[in-house]
Amino acid sequence: MNPQDIKTALGSGLLSFPVTHFHADGRFNAESYKQHIEWLAGYDAPVLFAAGGTGEFFSLAPSEIPGIVSAAKEAAGKTAIVAGCGFGSVVGVEIAKAAEKAGADGLLLLPHYLIDAPQEGLYALVKQICDAVGIGVMVYNRDNSVLGVETLARLCDACPNLVGFKDGTGQIGLVRQITATMGDRLIYLGGMPTAELFAEAYLGAGFTTYSSAVFNFVPGLAVEFYRALRAGDRPTCERLLRDFFYPFMAIRNRRKGYAVAAIKAGVRLQGFAAGPVRAPLDDLTIEEEAMLDALIGTWKR
């Protein structure tokens, strides 16, 4: 898929980041993963992100990523697959090339590993990744990797295949300046944990869409919220926030890392053999899984 096509796909609907399925011993469970991807693709997600943040990119070996991308492509049908990429310049370029070879339609460049870096260094890293592939690339502002407006503008000029910007900082002033400055040069994706909690603010700041983590296990509910948001149906949005998203947030906030672990628990509760999270994350307790099971309620498949 060429960069313009993936840009169009990214902006055409609700997106999600499937969890990566593991066997009990930690190995990638390709069959269960493909079953899950096929189920999600049936809800007309235009793009799914393989080996992204919710997919435990940070705990994957670079050598595992092409197999995950390939499995996602096999099961996704018409749904495009964007692969996670990151760590640093050398490893990042290797991952980018391998993901493209495995069939990825685009890349999401996650924050680099550990260290704070100046804007010039961030510019160089993003440019190296973009230059290494022919597919579209989306950058992710979060934690120690926050591109400023001028840096992002330079990258837009230097990298024709830079097609998207995802924000996980919550800095609405910065993201509004970015959308006002870059306009339709990029597609804009809200990427805060449990993005539905912030979706109205981000759409008001000029963002195109967002990625829904809960789409992993309650895709029908996630789509209902998205459609209500797009239609300006505030009563429905508020009902779903009260009845599902705020109670889910309470479970998610019980321990660090539950933004991923709670999603994977939801996938298991829907009958998929998603397996455990990898260290350093930890799974929900039996009590917490019961709370989540009750919350899913009528949204069981």
Curated annotation (Swiss-Prot):
Q: Which UniProt keywords apply?
A: Lyase
CDD domains assigned to the protein according to its UniProt record, in alphabetical order: KDGDH (cd00951)
Q: What is its EC number?
A: 4.2.1.41
EC supergroup of this enzyme:
lyase
Entry keyword Amino-acid biosynthesis: no
One GO MF term attached to the UniProt entry: 4-hydroxy-tetrahydrodipicolinate synthase activity
Concerning Pfam families, the annotation shows: DHDPS
Biological pathway: Carbohydrate acid metabolism; D-glucarate degradation; 2,5-dioxopentanoate from D-glucarate: step 2/2
Q: Does the keyword Lyase apply?
A: yes
Reaction catalysed by this enzyme: 5-dehydro-4-deoxy-D-glucarate + H(+) = 2,5-dioxopentanoate + CO2 + H2O
Any one of the GO BP annotations: D-glucarate catabolic process
Q: Which InterPro entries match?
A: Aldolase_TIM, DapA-like, Dehydro-deoxyglucarate_dehyd
Q: Which HAMAP family match?
A: KDGDH
| Protein family according to the UniProt entry | Belongs to the DapA family.
Name assigned to this protein: Probable 5-dehydro-4-deoxyglucarate dehydratase
Organism whose genome encodes this protein: Xanthobacter autotrophicus (strain ATCC BAA-1158 / Py2)
